[in-house]
Design a protein with these regions (language model features):
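Conserved class I S-adenosyl-L-methionine
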Residues: 2-62, 64-73, 155-177, 215
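Acceptor-substrate binding/catalytic loop of class I
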Residues: 172-189
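Conserved catalytic loop of SAM-dependent methyltransferase domains
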Residues: 46, 191, 197-234
Length: 246
């Protein structure tokens, strides 16, 4: 587990990035640029995972909303929730280029989620698999406030620490793409960081127990078994919903 996102002093949005943060961000920009160009044997696993996430987010976000996604990748999740006005932010130029090509009806901007300021508010803000990957989770969450109204809902999903070792094993076996250093955060960690950023956690759902694309079995485990104790403790990801504190 890396602790950089929790250990160093959080810097207010808008301040210049430190050299370490710049290097960290550049490493990720290169990684995701490369990721956007690859199509290898592990793609079916990722496609299955992303499809299930899209189902979950469609359940939580009604169509026709104003939606902002930070770390939007190719824009697939943003498009899946069918926003009336959708904006995606990503630090990877290659990802943004792909998103613009795939979904010309949406708006995509290359930028850093720690400091982006769009001068607009949204009904929903999505941070999917983002807090695991960013330099400073607290700064990221504090920066969301400028895009929130009192009724805005922030939706995050984050990998469970239970899956850290299985993930490393899958990487060694070539089943998934090797990741850069991650923030393996517990739900309680994210809740505390949300509170520090002036957000209140209002919903937690544990999702995806069977991340392998197998007919019927995947549906059974991921829609039913994962909701039952103690199997929910083994879920791959947690989906959290938060709102601004008054």
């Amino acid at each position: 587990m890396t602790t950089h996102a929790l250990a160093h002093d959080s810097q207010p949005p808008g301040l210049p990035a430190t050299r370490k943060q710049q290097d960290y961000t550049e490493d990720r920009r290169r990684y995701w640029d490369e990721f956007s160009r690859e199509s290898t044997g592990w793609q079916p696993l990722r496609t299955f995972y992303q499809k299930r996430l899209a189902e979950i987010y469609r359940f939580l976000i009604p169509p026709g909303m104003r939606v902002l996604e930070l770390g939007c990748s190719r824009g697939d999740l943003l498009a899946a929730v069918k926003p009336a006005y959708g904006v995606g932010i990503d630090l990877s130029p290659a990802m943004i280029a792909a998103a613009k090509s795939l979904y010309p009806e949406l708006h995509f901007i290359e930028g850093d989620a720690h400091s982006i300021d769009l001068g607009a508010q949204f009904d929903y803000i999505i941070c999917s698999d983002l807090v695991n990957d960013v330099w400073d989770v607290e700064t990221l969450l504090k920066n969301l406030a400028r895009h929130c109204s009192p009724s805005t809902r922030v939706l995050l999903n984050t990998y469970s620490r239970v899956w850290e070792l299985p993930r490393r094993l899958a990487e060694k076996l070539g089943l998934v793409k090797k990741t850069l250093t991650q923030n393996w955060l517990m739900t309680s960690d994210v809740e505390n960081l949300l509170y520090l950023a002036n957000f209140e956690l209002i919903r937690v759902g544990r999702e995806i127990l069977w991340p392998v694309p197998t007919p019927l079995v995947g549906t059974f485990f991921n829609k039913f078994v994962v909701k039952l104790w103690p199997f929910d403790l083994l879920a791959l990801t947690s989906v959290l919903v938060a709102r601004p504190l008054p």
